[in-house]
Amino acid sequence: MEFGLSWVFLAAILKGVQCEVQLVESGGGLVQPGGSLRLSCAASGFTFSNSDMNWVHQAPGKGLEWVSGVSWNGSRTHYADSVKGRFIISRDNSRNTLYLQTNSLRAEDTAVYYCVR
């Protein structure tokens, strides 16, 4: 995997100002096998346009698994073999938003999806 994942557990405090990283996912739902969903992740509290971004997921009873990553400017994308050709990662730096278009969904794609830096 070309993109390293960094985990932020504490809000940074600089000169008395609290800077809280927020990543808010939306767009999930229940679909039939073969269906599609578009996931969104609204980012704030950091310079989104300078940051490589990733999607990970956690299937029921399992650990976190990397799904896809995109470079800061969207020019490079990478996918786990299990989703290659079915999922499309993209970003809109003007809206500080990351997307994951999920197509041809399978039962094994059932998971909680998170965006991470």
Curated annotation (Swiss-Prot):
* UniProt-annotated stretches for the region Framework-1: 20-44
Q: Chief localization class?
A: secreted
User: What segment(s) does the record annotate as region Complementarity-determining-2?
Assistant: 70-77
Limits of the Ig-like domain: 31-117
Q: Where is this region: Complementarity-determining-1?
A: 45-52
Instruction: From the UniProt entry, list the residue stretches annotated as the region Complementarity-determining-3.
Output: 116-117
The record, for PROSITE patterns, names: IG_LIKE
Question: What residues are glycosylation sites in this protein?
Answer: 73
Q: Which GO terms describe its molecular function?
A: antigen binding
Keywords of this entry: Adaptive immunity, Cell membrane, Disulfide bond, Glycoprotein, Immunity, Immunoglobulin, Immunoglobulin domain, Membrane, Secreted, Signal
The protein's matches in InterPro entries, at most eight in alphabetical order, are given as: Ig-like_dom, Ig-like_dom_sf, Ig-like_fold, Ig_V-set, IgHV
User: Domain of life of the organism in this record?
Assistant: Eukaryota
Q: Does the keyword Electron transport apply?
A: no
GO BP annotations of the record are:
immunoglobulin mediated immune response
- Keyword Glycoprotein (UniProt): yes
Q: List the disulfide bonds.
A: 41-115
* Record's subunit section: Immunoglobulins are composed of two identical heavy chains and two identical light chains; disulfide-linked.
Q: Which PANTHER family match?
A: IMMUNOGLOBULIN HEAVY CHAIN (PTHR23266)
Q: Give the protein's biological function.
A: Probable non-functional open reading frame (ORF) of V region of the variable domain of immunoglobulin heavy chains. Non-functional ORF generally cannot participate in the synthesis of a productive immunoglobulin chain due to altered V-(D)-J or switch recombination and/or splicing site (at mRNA level) and/or conserved amino acid change (protein level). Immunoglobulins, also known as antibodies, are membrane-bound or secreted glycoproteins produced by B lymphocytes.
The name of this protein is Probable non-functional immunoglobulin heavy variable 3-35
- Source species, please? Homo sapiens (Human)
**According to the entry, what is the taxonomic lineage of the organism?**
Eukaryota, Metazoa, Chordata, Craniata, Vertebrata
